[in-house]
Design a protein with these regions (language model features):
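An N-terminal hydrophobic leader/cap segment in hydrolases
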Residues: 1-26, 30-40, 135, 239-258
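Serine-hydrolase catalytic machinery in alpha/beta-hydrolase-like enzymes
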Residues: 23-25, 30-38, 44-122
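Gly/Ala-rich beta-loop-alpha elbow adjacent to hydrolase catalytic centers
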Residues: 131-140
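Acidic catalytic loop of the alpha/beta-hydrolase fold
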Residues: 160-161, 183-188, 213-214
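Short alpha-helix in the alpha/beta-hydrolase fold that links the catalytic acid
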Residues: 165-167, 188-198, 220
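Short beta-strand/loop motif that positions the catalytic acidic residue
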Residues: 173-174, 178-181, 185
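Catalytic histidine neighborhood in serine/cysteine hydrolases
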Residues: 198-214
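Catalytic histidine-centered segment of alpha/beta-hydrolase-like enzymes
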Residues: 211-223
């Protein structure tokens, strides 16, 4: 369904974008499926390479925060959003080859996504940042400290797989790192997160009052998206809450709800 005129942006609002199905080829020979969402009528000013939550607990490229970022940020903030399924993960887009490997061989998946963004020419994908959620934050910390990446935004970081050596690597890189930590998170809450991330002097830990690990609720979605935009494209926030133009209302798809860890 579509309509013209100013409308409130809601959970199921899909704003205009140029959407392209993509495939990533890993160094160990796997094909991963994904999507690149671009601003509808101009080149992007920044790029998010997204890393989804734990696939064994329902995480995939369509986990709701990542999907809503792709629905809104290209049109509202001229930000490109790259989403993909890590090895062995399935979504309506398809299934990536391989099998889940407990954050070990997933290093090849992260590298393939970063390389895709780095070499893109039509259009160039500038100002590249990692956006990880839960398990995806571990992948960002472990494998995302790449010369072509400006920094990282971490949503609900559990620090389950990433170790002190990975935090040290980010500390010595000097790259900005922002961790958005729900007040009521199931795994790592703001106070403990501040202690853990003190190993990275430039890290900024933002506690979000009332939020939980899955960020359910439109107010939390808007808070997350505003923090993302403030980090990668300062001055473009706060995002509008209405859209004066064509919109599409998405239909719920099986299995696209909030993920686990």
């Amino acid at each position: 369904m579509s309509a013209a005129g100013a409308r409130e942006i809601r959970a199921n609002t899909v704003l205009p974008a140029r959407r392209r199905d993509i495939e990533l080829l890993t160094a160990d020979g796997l094909r991963l499926v994904g999507e690149l969402a671009l601003p509808p009528d101009r080149d992007p000013v920044a790029t998010l390479v997204t890393l989804h939550p734990l696939p064994t607990h329902g995480g995939f490229m369509d986990s709701h925060l990542l999907k809503k970022a792709s629905y809104r940020l290209p049109a509202l903030a001229d930000i490109a959003v790259l989403r993909f399924n890590t090895r062995g993960t399935t979504s309506p887009r398809g299934t990536s080859e391989g099998a889940f490997h407990d954050a070990r061989d997933e290093r090849f998946d992260v590298a393939a996504a970063i390389e895709f963004a780095r070499v893109a020419v039509d259009p160039v994908l500038p100002n590249r940042w990692l956006l990880g959620w839960s398990f995806g934050t571990d992948l960002a910390l472990m494998y995302g400290n790449d010369p072509s990446i400006k920094g990282a935004i971490l949503l609900s970081p559990p620090l389950k797989f990433a170790g002190p050596e990975h935090l040290h690597g980010w500390a010595t890189s000097g790259k900005p790192l922002v961790a958005l930590v729900p007040e009521l998170d199931d795994y790592l809450r703001p106070g403990e997160a501040a202690q853990q991330f003190s190993a990275i002097p430039q890290a900024r830990v933002v506690g979000v009052e009332g939020a939980r690990h899955l960020w359910v609720g439109e107010s939390y979605v808007r808070r997350v998206l505003d923090e993302i935009v403030a980090t990668v494209s300062p001055g473009a926030e706060p995002l509008p809450t209405t859209w004066d133009g064509e919109v599409v209302l998405s239909l719920p798809e099986p299995g696209t709800g909030p993920p686990g860890l």
